[in-house]
């Protein structure tokens, strides 16, 4: 995000306030250096049991973070609030990611490699992600493009628009995002959807936990195919992308 992060010593204590980034740190071989995570850092499954949980992504316990005495705090522009970042950077070096596409992910990995002296592992991860992407692109060549709406919330209904990582992943999947002309996460009505000639509606399992009951209800109301999809593979960047392309294959049919 164009911020200078000044480190006066090698990093040995990391507080990470974003689930995607926590998982990525572990996959880069840095688990021993993580001292604090959020309650939403669910991967790997044991991480919240062995590290201090300092709150959520929008509200953190600053006293807990202070007791952990971190060398650096890792944040994300979308997940964490400006208030959290500004409060923390008065006391600690803070690195803030702004990830909306694959290139941003690769840049984040490159920066982590430099910050945490793990450039070799970071480079290997980048190469693996790019290889998976290349193979998936080949797989997708024969697929028909579908016009979709990707739901992230209910009451009110909200969908993914442009300038989001989800939108980028929809593009990689060969989907035409019906809300590509709108910014971020617009609110929509079911009446609006009827006029869009959609081929498919995708209901994400996060942040709102859409279930099969929602899927069946919307399908009956709109008469459009509705699929329940794993939101982690559409919205988590970093090492989660390694498994994403295999998951996407299953969505499109092997």
Predicted feature residues:
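N-terminal ligand-binding lobe of clamshell/alpha-beta domains
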Residues: 1-254
């Amino acid at each position: 995000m164009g911020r200078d992060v000044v480190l006066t010593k090698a990093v040995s204590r990391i507080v990470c306030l974003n689930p995607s980034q926590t998982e990525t740190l572990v996959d880069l071989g840095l688990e021993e250096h993580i001292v604090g995570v959020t309650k939403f850092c669910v991967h790997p499954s044991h991480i919240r049991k062995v590290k201090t949980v300092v709150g959520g992504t929008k509200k953190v316990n600053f006293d807990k973070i202070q007791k952990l005495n971190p060398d650096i705090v890792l944040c994300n522009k979308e997940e964490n609030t400006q208030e959290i970042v500004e409060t923390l950077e008065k006391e600690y070096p803070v690195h803030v990611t702004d990830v909306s596409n694959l290139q941003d992910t690769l840049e984040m990995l490159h920066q982590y490699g430099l910050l945490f002296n793990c450039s070799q592992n970071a480079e290997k991860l980048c190469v693996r992600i790019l290889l998976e992407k290349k193979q998936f692109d080949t797989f997708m060549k024969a697929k028909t493009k579908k016009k979709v709406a990707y739901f992230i919330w209910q009451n009110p209904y909200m969908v993914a628009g442009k300038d989001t990582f989800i939108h980028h992943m929809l593009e990689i999947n060969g989907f035409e995002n019906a809300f590509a002309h709108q910014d971020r996460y617009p609110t929509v009505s079911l009446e609006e959807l009827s006029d869009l000639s959609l081929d498919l509606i995708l209901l994400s399992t996060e942040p709102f936990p859409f279930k099969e009951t929602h899927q069946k209800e919307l399908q009956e109301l709109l008469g459009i195919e509705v699929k329940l999809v794993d939101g982690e593979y559409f919205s988590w960047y970093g090492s989660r992308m390694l498994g994403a392309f295999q998951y996407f294959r299953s969505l499109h049919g092997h």
